[in-house]
Amino acid sequence: MASSATMLSSVATAARAAPAQASMVAPFVGLKSASAFPVTQKPATGLSTLPSNGGRVQCMKVWPIVGLKKFETLSYLPTLSVESLLKQIEYLIRNGWVPCLEFSLEGFVSRDNNKSPGYYDGRYWTMWKLPMFGCTDAAQVVKEAAECKKEYPAAFIRVIGFDNVRQVQCVSFIVEKPE
C-alpha cells in the first residue's frame, strides 16, 4: 500500500512539473517585420567606380598550351639558378623534411589503359637512390641531382621534401628538364 502511494505521488509531481516547463518557452509569434531592420542603399553610380586592372588584361595569360609542360609550384618560373635551388633545398631541410630525388623520362600524366591512377600513368616517378635521411647539406642534394642528370640526360628530375613523421610529401619542384 505504501509503495502505491509513493508511485501516485511521484506521478502527481511529474504532472505538475510538465506544465511549468512548457510555459518557460515563449510562443512563436512570427518573423519580425522588415521595418525593424534598417536598410542602407548604396548610391547608384556608373561603371567607372568598379575595380579594374586597366590595360593589364593582355598580361594575364598563364602558360602556352603547346611545347611547355608545367608541373609543380615553381614550374611557372624560369629555370632555377644554382643559388635559388640551394635556397629551396635549404628551406625544406630547415623544416625537417627529408630530401628525395625522383626522375621521369616522360614527365606527363596519361591514363591510356585504365581510369584509376596507377604506377605507370606518369603520376608516380622513379626514385633516384634512397631518400636522403639525415641530410643537412643542400649541396649534397644538388650533387645527387647532377649525378642523376648525367645518368639520365633526357629525364625530368624533381626534388621532394618528405615529412617522415606525418608521412606526406610537403614540397616538390623540378630541378632539371631535358633539353
From Swiss-Prot:
Pfam families: RbcS (PF12338), RuBisCO_small (PF00101). It comes from the Eukaryota. One of its GO terms (molecular function) is ribulose-bisphosphate carboxylase activity. Residues 1-58 form a transit peptide. Gene3D superfamilies: Ribulose bisphosphate carboxylase, small subunit. It is found in: Plastid, Chloroplast. Its main location: plastid. GO terms for cellular component: chloroplast. Keywords: Calvin cycle, Carbon dioxide fixation, Chloroplast, Photorespiration, Photosynthesis, Plastid, Transit peptide. GO terms for biological process: photorespiration; reductive pentose-phosphate cycle. The keyword Cytoplasm does not apply. InterPro entries: RuBisCO_ssu, RuBisCO_ssu_dom, RuBisCO_ssu_N, RuBisCO_ssu_sf. The keyword rRNA-binding does not apply. SUPFAM superfamilies: RuBisCO, small subunit. Heterohexadecamer of 8 large and 8 small subunits. Belongs to the RuBisCO small chain family. RuBisCO catalyzes two reactions: the carboxylation of D-ribulose 1,5-bisphosphate, the primary event in carbon dioxide fixation, as well as the oxidative fragmentation of the pentose substrate. Both reactions occur simultaneously and in competition at the same active site. Although the small subunit is not catalytic it is essential for maximal activity. This is Ribulose bisphosphate carboxylase small subunit, chloroplastic 3. It comes from Fritillaria agrestis (Stinkbells). The gene is RBCS3.
